[in-house]
Amino acid sequence: MIKLTHISKVFQQGSRTITALSDVSLHVPAGQIYGVIGASGAGKSTLIRCANMLERPTSGQVLVDGQDLTTLSEGQLTRARRQIGMIFQHFNLLSSRTVYGNIALPLELDNTSRADIKKRVNELLDLVGLTDKQDAYPANLSGGQKQRVAIARALASNPKVLLCDEATSALDPATTRSILELLKDINRRLGLTILLITHEMDVVKRICDQVAVISEGKLIEKDSVSEVFSHPKTPLAQQFIQSTLHLDIPEDYAKRMSPEPTVDHVPLLKLEFTGKSVDAPLISQAVRRFNIDIGILSSQMDYAGGVKFGVMLAELHGDVQDGLAAIKFLQDHHVKVEVLGYV
């Protein structure tokens, strides 16, 4: 549905040349939710703006539903954009228009009949759960309600594609979850293809089918969400994943932790489980097989792309050689083991 091929974008600022995107290729299959994650300044917003030609690429090809947008005239591009909805971090609603009026605006600009506008707006109000707010003005809406209006407006022309530019960044966690559930529901019910950019792995984890990691204008990793969470190939992907599951070392442990093994101190382990290793009784097997004890301090588990993953902090008690053998056993069964120190 969306195919970006060898996209580069270079900006000129006086005598400076800034490369925002460098040879980026990306394919978003029809009906999927595809996330692009990266830190601030990585090129995410430039990438998504190239997808509907709000930014014209310096080089490369932009295909949406088989049509190359880079070859179109302004008039042709305007018509093609009717198939591409877009929502932003800041909702960009017209303060002088009601909820109904904001959603109706694209249809009015397209010279749709008043009867058809009313029918379509009412459908969208029902879809986004705002049937009781049609006469309200943006100033009287919460952030989540404003974003729901923006989503409805973006869907007014029945687009095949929805672009989401940091659509939940300005929202609190509970509202973020509700907006993500709405996007997932719209994707499922309408078969809408969604390309979203974010700096939060939680967003990717909750609704995306595939994910790409962008850094300094380049895509450094891309795969299904389950594969990236199970087997991240780059340090940046690992960093984003760890941000979703983070266990702090208890303060009293941190104060007495030593970087080197000492008498009467035991290893403090961080164990990361993904895929099948989450369900397997590996801890109890290691305890029995190697005559060790494992004291669990804290643990956390979650899902991403249909795959479970988790993290655990634990003390390892027993003979040093038995402990090393137990660690190797866990690693051989796809558990990532890190010795944080000795306590």
Curated annotation (Swiss-Prot):
ATP binds at residues 38-45. SUPFAM superfamilies: ACT-like, P-loop containing nucleoside triphosphate hydrolases. It comes from the Bacteria. It is a peripheral membrane protein. Its main location: membrane. Pfam families: ABC_tran, NIL. The keyword Acetylation does not apply. Keywords: Amino-acid transport, ATP-binding, Cell inner membrane, Cell membrane, Membrane, Nucleotide-binding, Translocase, Transport. Residues 2-241 form the ABC transporter domain. GO terms for cellular component: Gram-negative-bacterium-type cell wall; plasma membrane. GO terms for molecular function: ABC-type D-methionine transporter activity; ATP binding; ATP hydrolysis activity. Its EC number is 7.4.2.11. The complex is composed of two ATP-binding proteins (MetN), two transmembrane proteins (MetI) and a solute-binding protein (MetQ). Belongs to the ABC transporter superfamily. Methionine importer (TC 3.A.1.24) family. Part of the ABC transporter complex MetNIQ involved in methionine import. Responsible for energy coupling to the transport system. NCBIfam families: ABC_MetN. This is Methionine import ATP-binding protein MetN 2.
